[in-house]
Amino acid sequence: MAKELKELTPRSESYSQWYQDLVIKADLAENSAVRGCMVIKPYGYAIWEKMQRQLDDMFKETGHVNAYFPLFIPKSFLSREAEHVEGFAKECAVVTHYRLKANPDGDGVVVDPQAKLEEELIVRPTSETIIWNTYKNWIQSHRDLPILCNQWANVVRWEMRTRLFLRTAEFLWQEGHTAHATKEEAEEEARRMLEVYATFAEEYMAMPVVKGVKSANERFAGAVDTYTIEALMQDGKALQSGTSHFLGQNFAKAFNVTFADKDGNRDFVWATSWGVSTRLMGALIMSHSDDNGLVLPPKLAPYQVVIIPIYRNEEQLAQIDEKATQITQALRAKGISVKYDNSDNKKPGWKFAEYELKGIPVRLAMGARDLENNTIEIARRDTLTKETVGLDGIEETVATLLDDIQKNIFQKALNYRKEHTITVDSYEEFKEKIEDGGFILAHWDGTSETEERIKAETKATIRCIPLNGDMTPGKCMVTGKPSPQRVLFARAY
């Protein structure tokens, strides 16, 4: 049964199917009755809650507060920012009526034709328009600035080709929307939030990222600049994991949001927006997991430790229960989250397989011999190694091990990225190497035409213009025209 529980398609056989198998079998999420929408199951949601809690703390540490804005946006609002509406028009879900009625045929319900809305409503794909319409009422003077708001919400972008967590019609996210008196302050905010995302990705998700700026083609609709963090998955594809946008005065002008400065002169407000979504769940799964199941960084695991008793009779179980309770209390006193699984409906072998599949970082197993010797077996999920250790100071042993696992998972992902990042100078070499996956650093002439040609011919996109990259100028690999620095290419999710 334990083998059946864990039967995942190997990554080498089909990475896509492995991912799908893992999300389902590890009880993270499943498809719903609504096409393109997912059910996030309790175990998956527990991971998302840990992400949410940590990010929320980081937002508040940088001066942000939470608010909530409507799910529905009047269609006319989207029309006010031309680039913005063009970017989202094909993905919008539209509400046209406000009532149902009983079917005259007696079969279920139908839309009441008398209940047509005067103005159609858009189910939010993102909230810039509704928020800036609101900010107009909040901002009169420089004393009202800055506004530093974040919203935790769901959004809808009608996707035809969906994958659990990575691309769904409805997803959960946070979106920050800030208003500032100066361009410099807004630009600083956009960069600050990029740093917050990068810190979260690397220190909590144990996922190395490249920080950069998007090209004009890849920029958020309505933004002046889009900053991004890009991660490399185990199949050699990039995953955009968070974005922060400097919006200039575009939305302030669209909604006529002005303020009086210290001299009484009126000017348009400067803006940013920034967000991450449940897509991070997909990034977390694909960054670290293996053919045995999830590998979770301890900082985001719902439980960091699971304790499993191994016993022959009720007397042994009672003795192990007593000792396990002491261990659990000692670990929790150190801030370590623990689950003691003494359920009698599954054998230890099944439990080992289940918690390995679910990526619990540390497994402790205790049997009768351990009771006699004052020892316990300790197994780590990241390396699948185990050893028997003394119980004295077990909380220190586990705390040190969790810290080591967090660092090891990050280092492993970093090593993978280093091994799969190359530099090329010729377009012929680029076309050959892109088939192997990974990041490619190459010179580009800065034009949309060249970027579109590369995408059409190779399916690779410019993931970002790295902020801390190789600033040596050169010649575009396609046209030979001057290039100020290398940019990061990859095929992407």
UniProtKB/Swiss-Prot annotation:
HAMAP family to which the protein is assigned, alphabetical: Pro_tRNA_synth_type3 (MF_01571)
Note on domains (UniProt): Consists of three domains: the N-terminal catalytic domain, the anticodon-binding domain and the C-terminal extension.
Protein name: Proline--tRNA ligase
GO molecular function list: ATP binding; proline-tRNA ligase activity
Gene: proS
Assembly and binders: Homodimer.
Domain of life where this protein originates: Bacteria
EC number, UniProt record: 6.1.1.15
The entry's keywords: Aminoacyl-tRNA synthetase, ATP-binding, Cytoplasm, Ligase, Nucleotide-binding, Protein biosynthesis
